[in-house]
């Protein structure tokens, strides 16, 4: 046998043994899942950047059950009751949260002890009490100044600066993305939009809110039950986060459905999957129906709030979630005071941008490499605009899902 043939045969034999071990003799072999996902991480990587990831995850749970082996060392879960188990206070984040800059921030710190210390340092600035002091000053001006002064490609940023920039990014990108979803689902349902507008007019007439031409406060917006129901339903039905993985704790591991998960296993679930769980929200969980929040009993509402997942879960829940809610309530109330006409246009090829951060370990040093690209997939373009025939003056034109 020639050396080349021997080398090729040996390579294939090693690969075959590795595949057999991962598929049938791995500690996670007892959990069902797709074959490719159990033998290679490329399966998970591919679906992370695919625009239909959430639909694919839903199909996996339909086929394999509430716990699916998604990668050689990873599980995805569709069971709200397991959220407190997965996101316990000792759970460390995985390498999924690779730092965007070459240093860690409060958000990207993997070790829960380091996160607690970092969280305490900024809690006074973005916590619940700070929210009331800063309602009228929160905006994008600071973010614009920071990026003009420090280019991430030319200037090294120190840790406090990284923390500040990532905090601004969280408030200036994730929340508007959620706001777009709120307005989209309200505007595409005429009955919901009409009911919300009637609530705004009634609240204006009885003095609960100022005239619709004035600026509404967060406190006043929270007095509107149907507006609150629309926002909570949009957060359930169309969240912005894809998944939030955690490692099974060192030393103890986890127990999921009476099955042991060894330490170091990546366990994740998705706000989109939990929000569509029929055991939690009923058989119409796949429908956008804000009325469910008004019809729910106090026990049901408490249960839904307990498993609310759009700002994260557990000890690492977003510290500034009050700021995000403030933006959602205030802007949604202002925009929906002007009836919106929704135009949904089909595009043969819709471009979706993706951004992947790769964490590479070379010669003992960690390097962060970002990869950007575009996927061309069939899709729809949404343009929402104010009804020009409405009695209020002004014009609103929003491309909510820009390619």
Curated annotation (Swiss-Prot):
Its EC number is 1.-.-.-. It is an enzyme of class 1 (oxidoreductase). Keywords: Glycoprotein, Heme, Iron, Metal-binding, Monooxygenase, Oxidoreductase, Signal. Its cofactor is heme. Heme binds at residue 318. Disruption phenotype: Impairs the production of ustiloxin B but accumulates intermediates such as ustiloxin F and C. Glycans are attached at residues 52, 92. One of its GO terms (molecular function) is heme binding. Residues 1-18 form the signal peptide. InterPro entries: Cyt_P450, Cyt_P450_CS, Cyt_P450_sf, Cytochrome_P450_monoxygenase. Disulfide bonds: none annotated. Pfam families: p450. Pathway: Mycotoxin biosynthesis. Belongs to the cytochrome P450 family. Cytochrome P450 monooxygenase; part of the gene cluster that mediates the biosynthesis of the secondary metabolite ustiloxin B, an antimitotic tetrapeptide. First, ustA is processed by the subtilisin-like endoprotease Kex2 that is outside the ustiloxin B gene cluster, at the C-terminal side of Arg-Lys, after transfer to Golgi apparatus through the endoplasmic reticulum (ER). Cleavage by KEX2 generates 16 peptides YAIG-I to YAIG-XVI. This is Cytochrome P450 monooxygenase ustC. It comes from Aspergillus flavus (strain ATCC 200026 / FGSC A1120 / IAM 13836 / NRRL 3357 / JCM 12722 / SRRC 167).
């Amino acid at each position: 046998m020639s050396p080349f043939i021997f080398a090729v045969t040996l390579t294939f034999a090693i690969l075959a043994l590795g595949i057999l071990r991962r598929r049938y003799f791995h500690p996670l072999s007892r959990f069902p899942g797709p074959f490719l996902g159990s033998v290679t991480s490329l399966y998970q990587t591919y679906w992370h950047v695919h625009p239909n990831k959430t639909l694919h995850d839903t199909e996996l749970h339909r086929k394999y059950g509430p716990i699916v082996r998604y990668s050689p060392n990873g599980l995805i879960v569709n069971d709200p009751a397991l959220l407190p188990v997965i996101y316990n206070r000792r759970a460390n984040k995985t390498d999924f949260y690779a730092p965007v800059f070459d240093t860690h921030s409060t958000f990207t710190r993997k070790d829960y002890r380091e996160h607690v210390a970092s969280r305490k340092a900024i809690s006074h600035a973005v916590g619940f009490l700070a929210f009331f002091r800063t309602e009228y000053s929160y905006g994008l001006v600071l973010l614009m100044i920071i990026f003009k002064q420090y280019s991430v490609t030319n200037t090294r940023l120190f840790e406090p600066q990284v923390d500040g920039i990532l905090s601004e990014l969280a408030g200036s990108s994730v929340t508007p993305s959620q706001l777009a979803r709120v307005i989209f689902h309200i505007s595409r349902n005429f009955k919901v939009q009409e009911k919300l507008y009637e609530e705004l007019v009634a609240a204006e007439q009885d003095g609960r809110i100022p005239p619709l031409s004035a600026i509404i406060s967060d406190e006043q917006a929270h007095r509107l039950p149907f507006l609150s129901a629309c926002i909570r339903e949009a957060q359930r039905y169309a969240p912005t986060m894809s998944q939030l993985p955690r490692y099974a704790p060192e030393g103890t591991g986890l127990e999921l459905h009476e099955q042991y998960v060894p330490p170091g296993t990546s366990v994740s679930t998705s706000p989109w999957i939990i929000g569509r769980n029929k055991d939690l929200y009923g058989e119409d969980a796949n429908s956008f129906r804000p009325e469910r929040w008004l019809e729910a009993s106090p026990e049901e509402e408490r249960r839904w709030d307990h498993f609310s997942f759009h700002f994260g879960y557990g000890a690492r829940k977003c510290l500034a979630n009050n700021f995000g809610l403030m933006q959602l309530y205030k802007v949604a109330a202002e925009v929906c005071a002007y009836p919106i006409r929704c135009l949904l246009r089909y595009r043969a090829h819709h471009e979706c941008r993706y951004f992947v951060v790769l964490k590479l370990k070379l010669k003992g040093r960690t390097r962060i490499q970002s990869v950007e690209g575009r996927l061309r997939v069939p899709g729809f373009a949404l343009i929402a605009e104010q009804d020009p025939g409405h009695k209020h003056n002004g014009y609103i034109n929003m491309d909510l899902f820009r390619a």
